[in-house]
From Swiss-Prot:
Active-site residues, as the UniProt record annotates them: 18 (proton acceptor)
Membrane-traversing stretches: none
Annotated organism of origin: Fervidobacterium nodosum (strain ATCC 35602 / DSM 5306 / Rt17-B1)
Enzyme Commission no: 3.1.1.29
The protein's name in its UniProt record: Peptidyl-tRNA hydrolase
Entry binding sites for tRNA: 13, 58, 60, 100
One cellular-component annotation, GO: cytoplasm
UniProt subcellular location: Cytoplasm
Keyword flag Disulfide bond: no
Entry's family note: Belongs to the PTH family.
Assembly and oligomerization: Monomer.
Length: 180
C-alpha cells in the first residue's frame, strides 16, 4: 500500500493549511529518502509494508508522482476547505471538489482512489481561498490539528488492518471540538 500526503515543498509552507497531508505523514515517519520527484519512507503497519510518499512538486502538480509509482493500492491524505477543522472524511473515490492537487491526481489515474479529507475550514468570507490555504494555522487551531493528525494516523492504521468500508463507518462521524 502507498499513502500519499499532499502539500507544498519547502519550509515556507510547512505549517500552512495546505500541508496537512505532509503533516500526517510526518507523524508516521521522520526518516525520508529522495525519489525522482518525491520523498518516501517505508514503514510497517500490522506486518504490512507501507510506502509513505510526499510529492515534491507544488500542489497543482501532485499527480505527476504517478509517473513513477503504481496506483492500484493507494490512499491520498489532503486538506479540505469544505470540511470544518476538527473533522476528517474517508471516501473510496470522488471528484476533486475544487482541490487542485486532487484534480492533478485525477488527471493521471482517474477518480477511483481512496482518500482521507482533513477539514481546514471554514474559510473566513473576507479571505481568498488560495490565500487561506497558504496561511499558517493559529496556535489554537494547532491544538485541534494535533488531535486530528493523530486521528488520521489511527485511521490509516485502521484502513490497513480492517479495510476502507469499516474505516468510513468508524471515523466519518467523529468530530474533535475546536472550542468555538
Amino acid at each position: 500500500m502507498i499513502v500519499i500526503g499532499l502539500g507544498n515543498p519547502g519550509e515556507k509552507y510547512s505549517n500552512t493549511r495546505h500541508n496537512v497531508g505532509f503533516m500526517v505523514l510526518d507523524r508516521l515517519s521522520n526518516s525520508w529518502k529522495k525519489g525522482p520527484n518525491y520523498l518516501y519512507s517505508d514503514i510497517n503497519i500490522s506486518g504490512e509494508k507501507i510506502k509513505l510518499i510526499k510529492p515534491m512538486t507544488y500542489m497543482n502538480l501532485s499527480g505527476e508522482v504517478f509517473k513513477y509509482l503504481p496506483h492500484d493500492d493507494i490512499i491520498v491524505v489532503y486538506d479540505d476547505l469544505d470540511l470544518p477543522l476538527g473533522k476528517i472524511r474517508i471516501r473510496k473515490n470522488g471528484s476533486a471538489g475544487g482541490h487542485n492537487g486532487i484534480k492533478s491526481i485525477i488527471s493521471f489515474i482517474g477518480q477511483d482512489f481512496p482518500r482521507i479529507r482533513v477539514g481546514i475550514g471554514p474559510k473566513p468570507e473576507n479571505i481568498d481561498a488560495a490565500d487561506y490555504v497558504l496561511s499558517n494555522f493559529t496556535k489554537e487551531e494547532f491544538e485541534v490539528l494535533d488531535k486530528i493528525i493523530n486521528l488520521c494516523t489511527e485511521a490509516i492504521e485502521y484502513i490497513v488492518e480492517n479495510g476502507i468500508d469499516k474505516a468510513m463507518n468508524r471515523y466519518n462521524s467523529i468530530e474533535i471540538s475546536t472550542g468555538k
